[in-house]
């Protein structure tokens, strides 16, 4: 990524996080914008979100984000339009790193427990 796309991605991550926190306060799962990846032409921004909750809550949250993408983009546009000629299209994707890390931690605990029992 070029320096410009990195700066744009960082700005979008901050602004999207603020929008989701202020404009869409929701009870339920914790939602965090973990990373934003943007295409070289600045036309598409993929926002990776971490959702801490059960499977149903995560699915509902992703459905909500996908349904509200146009409204979120409109709010984003009003906040950063003075910095960009064109606001990138938004795409939300779930970041499963937290779940993968939890699963690895769980596996490590079970291995430690088994090795402790076998000694």
From Swiss-Prot:
Keywords: Cytoplasm, Ribosome biogenesis. It is found in: Cytoplasm. One of its GO terms (molecular function) is ribosomal small subunit binding. The keyword Cytoplasm applies. SUPFAM superfamilies: Ribosome-binding factor A, RbfA. One of its GO terms (cellular component) is cytosol. Gene3D superfamilies: 3.30.300.20. Its main location: cytoplasm. GO terms for biological process: maturation of SSU-rRNA. One of several proteins that assist in the late maturation steps of the functional core of the 30S ribosomal subunit. Associates with free 30S ribosomal subunits (but not with 30S subunits that are part of 70S ribosomes or polysomes). Required for efficient processing of 16S rRNA. May interact with the 5'-terminal helix region of 16S rRNA. Monomer. Binds 30S ribosomal subunits, but not 50S ribosomal subunits or 70S ribosomes. NCBIfam families: rbfA. This is Ribosome-binding factor A.
């Amino acid at each position: 990524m070029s320096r410009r796309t990195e700066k744009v991605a960082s700005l979008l991550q901050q602004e999207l996080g603020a929008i989701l926190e202020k404009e869409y306060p929701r009870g339920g799962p914790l939602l965090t914008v973990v990373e934003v990846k943007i295409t070289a032409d600045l036309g598409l921004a993929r926002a990776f979100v971490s959702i801490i909750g059960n499977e149903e809550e995560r699915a509902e949250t992703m459905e909500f984000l996908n349904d509200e993408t146009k409204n979120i983009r409109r709010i984003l546009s009003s906040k950063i339009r003075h910095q960009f000629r064109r606001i990138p299209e938004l795409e939300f994707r779930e970041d499963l790193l937290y779940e993968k890390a939890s699963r690895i931690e769980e596996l490590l605990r079970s291995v430690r427990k088994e090795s402790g029992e076998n000694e």
